[in-house]
Amino acid sequence: MTAFRILSISAHGALEMLLGLLALVAPFALGFGLAGAVVTILLGVVLVGLALSTTDSGVRLSAHYAMDYGLAVGAAAAAVIIGLAGDRAALLFLIGLALSQLALNVSTRYSTRG
């Protein structure tokens, strides 16, 4: 399983920052409804915060690991709820965000070593 964990925690943080910034811009660029925009912006803010926490030694890596998986599950749940509300663009974006976060989680070495 560790053979697939090719990203260092710093690379993980950089990619997480990119995902967060993308989530902050997407509602305006893709024309989400109000609920989809609010949820996506909130997830973007959380992602940026998580990305910034990778450079701070005050946050344990095990806590960051748990928050990453929580965010992926939360984004998937939000996608379902927003999809039921009828916002197809936000649904597709949030599913992509959840899958991207999950792929990032699976490919990251949650270790300070190398």
Predicted region positions:
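A cytosolic-side transmembrane-helix exit/cap motif
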Residues: 57-63, 86, 111-114
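Extracellular/lumenal glycan-associated surfaces
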Residues: 8, 12-32, 44-54, 68-85, ...
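Residue-identity detector for threonine
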Residues: 2, 40, 54-55, 108, ...
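Short, Lys/Arg-rich, polar N-terminal cytosolic tail immediately upstream
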Residues: 1-7
